[in-house]
Amino acid sequence: MTDLGVAVVVEDDADVRNLVEAVLSQAGFEVHSAADGREGVDVIRRLQADVVTLDVGLPDIDGFEVLRRVRQFSDAYVVMLTARTDELDTLTALHTGADDFMTKPFRPRELRARVAAMMRRPRQDRISETPPVAGAAAPATRAPQDSVLRHNGLELNPDSRTVTVDGASAGLTRSEFDLLHALLKGAGAVRSKADLVRVVRGEYYRADAYIGESDERAVEVHIGNLRRKLRENPLQPRWLQTVRGVGYRLAPERD
C-alpha cells in the first residue's frame, strides 16, 4: 500500500475512469476502480477506502444513493463528479455527505489539488486511529491551553481537529470544521460567503478565482449541516449568526 492509502474511482465512462486513476496514482494512492454503483459500494467497503471519486450518473444506482450507502460504514473523503451543471446536484451531494463536487470536464491538476487539500485536514477519527511509532512519546491528549477556542459551551481544538459542545463530541466534516474554525477565529467579524468559499476550497484556491452563486450556496449548505450537528437554533444562534445578504459571523458571548 502506498503512503497516502487507498483511493477508489467509481465511474462508468472508461476514459474518465482511466484519467482519474492516473491522477490519483501519480498523487501516491493505491488506486482501485468500479464501473457501477453496487460494485463501487462493495469495493469501498472491502478495501476501506481513504478517498473516493464518485460519478453521479452511474448505470445502476446513481451516485447519490451510492454515497448514502457508503456513509453508513465509511468516512472516506468523497469527491463527486458529474457532467451536469444543475446546482441542485451540488446541493444534494453536500447534503448527502460529499466533501467536494466537480463538474466534467475537469482539470486533472485541480482534482489532485482538491484531494491533497482534504488529506492535509484529517478527520478526528483518522487522527485517533493513527498507529503509534515504536519508541515514540505518547501524543498529548490536549492542545496547549491558548490554542483551544471556546465560545458559549463549544470547544474547538485545532491541533486534534476535535469539537465538543457542552462536553459532547460533535463529528464534523473537513469543510464544516474549517468553516467553524474560521468563524471562531474571526471573533465576531463578518465573513462573506465568498471568503468562506476560499476557506472550504483550501490553500490551492487562488484569491482571484471566480466564485459563483453555486459556490456560495454550497457554503450555505455546509453552514446548515453544521448548525444541525451542533443542534443550534438559527433563530436564536449560540455560535453561527447570519448577516443577511453578506455572510456569517460568530454570535455574541452569552452570560
Residue ranges and their predicted role:
Residues 39, 245-247:
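Glycine-rich nucleotide-binding loop
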Residues 144-178, 190, 249-255:
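A structural micro-motif at secondary-structure boundaries
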Residues 162, 167-174, 178-238, 243-244:
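Positively charged, aromatic-enriched patches within helix-turn-helix-type DNA-binding elements
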Residues 1-2, 72, 148, 234, ...:
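Short, flexible hinge/linker loops that cap or flank conserved catalytic cores
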Residues 1-127, 131-137:
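N-terminal/domain-start alpha-helical segments
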Residues 122-160:
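CheY-like receiver
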